[in-house]
Design a protein with these regions (language model features):
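Zinc-dependent deaminase
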Residues: 1-39, 103-173
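Short beta-strand scaffold segments in enzyme catalytic cores
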Residues: 47-55
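Immediate flanking context of iron-sulfur cluster ligation sites
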Residues: 89-102
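Residues that line or immediately flank small-molecule/substrate-binding pockets and catalytic motifs
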Residues: 65, 99, 123
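Short beta->alpha transition motifs characteristic of CBS
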Residues: 58-65, 148
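A short, polar/charged loop-to-alpha-helix boundary motif
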Residues: 67-77
Length: 173
């Protein structure tokens, strides 16, 4: 689908800038939320992701499938690539991925393969989520790595953002 001539949907949401003093799960999820707003403003599905290691954000991305015409350009995949470059290794031991929606099968597999310590997501996805939603790749007994999972961090604002985007998108199409 050609998206170059389509008008982008105005985003009615504002970015949130939490205090830098407390760098907890909510702090990092707000960063991912702000990236999801950036995605919306670029007419992409509003999903954002950041990767934290040692209290610092080493990667930050949002969906870019339409802009890049690449079906793998999900926020999580892009952030994993950035993080691997930042640390100089594909193993992201000790790092945490924060993402505004539960990862799909592709992204869930990539998070496991990258050896992240944790994944924190806001909105569960019972249709395509693979870290506890539709299925749970993390619970495969034969896997040689398992993630710590935290669900529902800032679920309400992230869900409101996704719902509003798709409601406006359907109305515009």
């Amino acid at each position: 689908m050609n998206t170059e001539n389509r008008p982008s949907l105005p985003c009615p949401f504002d970015k949130v800038h939490p205090s830098q003093l407390v760098r907890d799960d909510e702090f990092y999820m707000w960063q991912a939320y702000n990236l999801a707003i950036d995605a919306w403003r670029q007419d992409e599905v509003p999903i954002g992701a950041v990767i934290e290691l040692g209290g610092e954000i080493i990667a930050a991305a949002h969906n870019q499938r339409d802009r890049t015409r690449d079906p793998t350009a999900h926020a999580e995949i892009l952030a994993l690539g950035q993080a691997s470059s930042a640390v100089g290794d594909w193993r992201l031991t000790g790092a945490t991925l924060y993402v505004t929606k539960e990862p799909c099968p592709m992204c869930s597999g990539a998070t496991l393969m990258s050896r992240l310590k944790r994944v924190v997501y806001a909105v569960p996805d019972p249709k395509m989520g693979c870290l506890g939603g539709a299925t749970d790749l993390n619970s495969l007994p034969q896997s040689n790595h398992h993630l710590e999972i935290a669900r529902g961090v800032l679920e309400k604002p992230c869900l409101e953002l996704l719902r509003a985007y798709f409601q406006l998108k359907r109305a515009a199409d």
